[in-house]
Amino acid sequence: SSVEPRSLSAYVWSFAAKPKGKNLVHHNVFFNQDYSDEFKKISSGRISEDPTLYVCAQEQSIKNNKNQRYEIIINAPPVSLNKISDKEEYDLCKEITFQKLKKMGLTFHPEPTTKNLTTPANFETLCPGADGSLYGLNPQKMMSTFQRPTTKTKIKGLYLTGGGVHPGPGLPMAALSGKHAAEMIKKDLALT
């Protein structure tokens, strides 16, 4: 039996800094010029030179002179498709991310370092066997949504929840998956 291809992974910068330039809201997306090209690059094992960047300004509503927490997410290939070394990966990711933000009018001080970057390989270490994938099986196939594991398993007392389980990826769907699991457990244990 063949192994089904995995969905996207990501490079995630998590850091505290002072922003300069563009005013941010809590959720910010900096789109690229060619969205389909970004995914062609990812499917060939590389990140785009012009990736879409998601920037979460976690403490945007708190006005102070201290460093504030940020998270920047860049789509990436799963580990099995990744074609570059760890050192190359870090250097490339840093250059691409912060040069693009600078062009868009946003800089951070201090700029993050290696310790602030979580890579697809780090996600694979955290969740062995997932290939660094964040969303389970590759959702590009027509029936992939219906092939996700369901909440209840064949093993008594084992229930699944999360973005790789029905109904699918993303925080709202993962939360809904958790709700489904809780309802199934209550039903199976005859709790009210």
Report residues per predicted region.
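Hydrophobic, well-ordered secondary-structure elements that form the walls
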Residues: 15, 72, 101, 158, ...
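Conserved FAD/dinucleotide-binding core of flavoprotein oxidoreductases
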Residues: 16-18, 64-100
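A glycine-rich dinucleotide-binding beta-alpha-beta segment and adjacent secondary-structure elements
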Residues: 54, 107-167
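Short glycine/proline-enriched loop/turn "hinge" motifs that connect secondary-structure elements
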Residues: 61-67, 149-154
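A conserved FAD-binding loop/helix module that cradles the flavin
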Residues: 163-186
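Active-site-proximal substrate-binding core of FAD-dependent oxidoreductases
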Residues: 186-192
